[in-house]
From Swiss-Prot:
ATP binds at residues 249-256. Its main location: cytoplasm. The keyword Metal-binding does not apply. One of its GO terms (cellular component) is spindle pole. This is Katanin p60 ATPase-containing subunit A1.
């Protein structure tokens, strides 16, 4: 706790008190007194303790003065209420109201007018004066009754609205099943809400059939996530499910797509986490986020935590460029992952939490994290058969010309990643549109019909697209990945 914060809060409290904002001043005074109490526990020197106690007493006296001012102001407000209370306490019977002339006696007319009226006015005018008092009483009584009537009407309207809301809510409460809510006691509400936003509740709608090739990777993910829920009695002891899977490979090979398929097909709670989710500018908050993430995953188990680009969160420790804050986050992540297995000999495998990670830089990952990610699989570039299958998946919504040969196109795409093949298909599908609108004005383009725009994609379009789109992964990169997976892989 900084002394600068205490001094700033004292300044703010005094400024609010001078400006007449006593409620805010009391809040700051109370906060300062609490902060000073905490600070006094940390002070070991007796002389300093005495000094701080004197300061505390002085500020406490100031706070009491502000309290007294607030009480005085409240008493002014309360002094005006008896009149209103007396008005509301008037009986409902009109005969009793007329028999109370006390308010009129408190408001006499000025002296000179009294003399004039007593000297020059006739007795009829004196006889008329009680009628004015009656009018005053009648008007005041009518106001009281009107106020009461309005209050009763407002209450009735509120009750009717509440009843309607309950009726509207009741069908939803019956139809929607009750879902367990994570108990956020002890954690910041904003942190819990931020992590709950990262839970993919809506299906990404990516099926296993939407992913071409990668048979081994799909088989491993099904074994790690799906089978333990189908056969919980089998996956116990030494057969416990894998608690960590690392997908390694060049960019654009389908690592994130596999994670989306896991979220769609495996029916587990899926946390999509990135480095921005687990980092904070406040000291110690990043570690809390990591711990909270795994506690929420255990609560919503069976769960899968997908950490994309994990090298940005848990790179190698002990380097000169490493910051203390990032080191603490890595330590907390490693501790939570080691205790996140949830599938020891006596635990239920259907309540597991699995960490699914993806990276393009496996050589930068810390050794301890590499040990915790028990299965390390290589996601390679698609084979010739995989490229042809990927072409069919990408072009299934397009109309193709009769001369299109997908097998020959796949052969010409050797070394292309899955993302590169998708880009080629997208570029080829736009070729016919480009030819059709060439030389036309914007008005003519707007007047084109849908039939004129949807023309079949030809083999020539693919050849032109292949000339424009080059592969994004070099042979040297592939060799580096294969060397790492040969040394550290666990398929």
């Amino acid at each position: 706790m900084s002394l600068l914060m205490i001094s700033e809060n004292v300044k703010l409290a005094r400024e609010y008190a001078l400006l007449g904002n006593y409620d805010s001043a009391m809040v700051y005074y109370q906060g300062v007194l609490d902060q000073m109490n905490k600070y006094l526990y940390s002070v070991k020197d007796t002389y300093l303790q005495q000094k701080w106690q004197q300061v505390w007493q002085e500020i406490n006296v100031e706070a009491k003065h502000v309290k007294d001012i607030m009480k005085t102001l409240e008493s002014f407000k309360l002094d005006s209420t008896p009149l209103k209370a007396a008005q509301h306490d008037l009986p409902a019977s009109e005969g009793e109201v007329w028999s109370m002339p006390v308010p009129v006696e408190r408001r006499p007319s000025p002296g000179p007018r009294k003399r004039q009226s007593s000297q020059y006015s006739d007795p009829k005018s004196h006889g008329n004066r009680p009628s004015t008092t009656v009018r005053v009483h009648r008007s005041s009584a009518q106001n009281v009754h009107n106020d009461r009537g309005k209050a009763v009407r407002c209450r009735e309207k509120k009750e009717q609205n509440k009843g309607r809301e309950e009726k509207n809510k009741s069908p939803a409460a019956v139809t929607e099943p009750e879902t367990n809510k994570f108990d956020s006691t002890g954690y910041d509400k904003d942190l819990v809400e931020a992590l709950e936003r990262d839970i993919i509740s809506q299906n990404p709608n990516v099926r296993w059939d939407d992913i071409a090739d990668l048979v081994e990777a799909k088989k491993l993910l099904k074994e790690a996530v799906v089978l333990p829920m189908w056969m919980p009695e089998f996956f116990k002891g030494i057969r416990r499910p894998w608690k960590g899977v690392l997908m390694v490979g060049p960019p654009g090979t389908g690592k994130t797509l596999l994670a989306k398929a896991v979220a769609t097909e495996c029916k587990t709670t899926f946390f999509n986490v990135s480095s921005s989710t687990l980092t904070s500018k406040y000291r110690g908050e990043s570690e809390k986020l990591v711990r909270l993430l795994f506690e929420m995953a255990r609560f919503y188990s069976p769960a899968t935590i997908f950490i994309d680009e994990i090298d940005s969160i848990c790179s190698r420790r002990g380097t000169s460029e490493e910051h203390e804050a990032s080191r603490r986050v890595k330590a907390e992540l490693l501790v939570q992952m080691d205790g996140v297995g949830g599938t020891s000999e006596n635990d239920d495998p259907s309540k597991m939490v699995m960490v699914l990670a993806a990276t393009n830089f496996p050589w930068d990952i810390d050794e301890a994290l590499r040990r915790r990610l028990e299965k390390r699989i290589y996601i390679p570039l698609p084979s010739a058969k995989g490229r042809e299958e990927l072409l069919r998946i990408s072009l299934r919504e397009l109309e193709l010309a009769d001369d299109v040969d997908l097998a020959s196109i796949a052969e010409n795409m050797e070394g292309y990643s899955g993302a590169d093949i998708t880009n080629v298909c997208r570029d080829a599908s736009l070729m016919a549109m480009r030819r059709r609108i060439e030389g036309l004005t914007p008005e003519e383009i707007r007047n084109l019909s849908k039939e004129e725009m949807h023309m079949p994609t030809t083999m020539e379009d693919f050849e032109m697209a292949l000339k424009k789109v080059s592969k994004s992964v070099s042979a040297a990169d592939i060799e580096r990945y294969e060397k790492w997976i040969f040394e550290f892989g666990s398929c």
